[in-house]
Amino acid sequence: MSTVFSAGTLSPLRSLSSTLKFSDVYPFKFHPNGYHPILSKSRSQSLIANSLLSDKFPTVAAPSVGPIPPSQLIEVVKTAANTGAQVVMEAVNKPRNITYKGSTDLVTETDKMSEAAILEVVKKNFDDHLILGEEGGVIGDTASDYLWCIDPLDGTTNFAHGYPSFAVSVGVLYRGKPAAAAVVEFVGGPMCWNTRLFSATAGGGAFCNGQRIQVSATNQVEQCLLVTGFGYDHDDAWATNIDLFKEFTDVSRGVRRLGAAAVDMCHVALGIVEAYWEYRLKPWDMAAGVLMVEEAGGTVSRMDGGKFCVFDRSVLVSNGLLHTENEVNEFYRLLLTQMKIRFFVPAPQLLNRIGPATEKLKNKGIDFSLWYKPENYRADV
C-alpha cells in the first residue's frame, strides 16, 4: 500500500529511516517541522537529477579549477576572506568613518582596509592573477585565467548600523566560472559579534565551519521563507521587484530583505531559506555565493531563466525544487515512484512568476547585457 503526502512535507520520510541509508557526515537537517535525516545521494538518483536539470539550468561552476590544486586554491581563498574579516572584526564596535559613493550607497574606511588586507594575501600567493575588487577595481594581468572577485564588506550599511547581516566575500573564477569561494558572515550583534565561515570548491561541495551543508528539501512556495534585495536606482527594475516582493509575501511564509547578497545566498546553501533573487548585482556580490548554493545542491539561473554567469545583471538561486515546476518535480515523481510513494505536485514555482516579469523589463529596453567583465579577460561564458 502506497503512502500519500503533500510535496514539501517531510514527516513520512522519518518512517523510512530504517530502510534508507543516511549520511554519516551530515545526518540531520533542520526543517520547520523538526530535524530530519538527510538521504545520501546514490549514483542513480544523482544521474536522474543531473539529467533533468543540466539542460534547463547549466552548472555555473568551473568544470576545472585549472593547474592550481583545489586544496591549495581554497586554502588561499579562505585565508584571504579570514584576513579581511579580522580587519572588520577589529572595527565592528568602533565609530565609523562613513563616506558616500551615491546618495545612499555607503563606504567606510573598513571597506578599504579589508580589501587592502585581502589583496595582500592574494598577491603574496598568486601575483600573476587578475583581481576585481569592489573598491579598487581591476588590478593585475588580464591574460590570467584566474579572476578574483572581492567584496571586502558586503552589507556596508548594515555594518555601519551594527545590524547583523554583513560579510567578507571572496570568490575566484577560472576562465569566467566560479572555482573556489569563501564567505565570512558576521553573526550576533553589538558587543557579542562572532563569525562563521562558508567555503566551496567546484565539484567539492559546500561547507560551513568545516561541516558539509545542503539546501532545504521544501518544494512548495507556500511553505518557504524567501529573500530578495533592492538596488539603489528606483527605476522599472526596482518597481518590478517591489511587485514581486508583494506577490511572494502573499503566497509564502515571508520574504526578507537583509541587504547582503553573499549572506543571502549562503543562507540558501545552508537550508534556512529556500531562494533568493535580485537585479543588478555585481560580480563581487555573486561570485562566491552562487558557487556555495550550487555546491550545496541548489540551482542558479538568471531571473528570466537563462544560463547564468557572474557578469549577468540578474540572479535567482534556490534549493532547486522551487526553481521551476516541470523538471524538478519530474525527478521527484520518478524517485518517489521507486519508493512506492504517491506524490502531490504543487502549484507553479518561482520562475513561473519571476521569469515573465523579467521578460517585460527586457521588452521595455532595460539593459541586461553582461557588465563589469574586465577588458580582454578570457571567459568561457
What label would you give each PLM region?
Residues 3-4, 213-381:
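An extended, acidic
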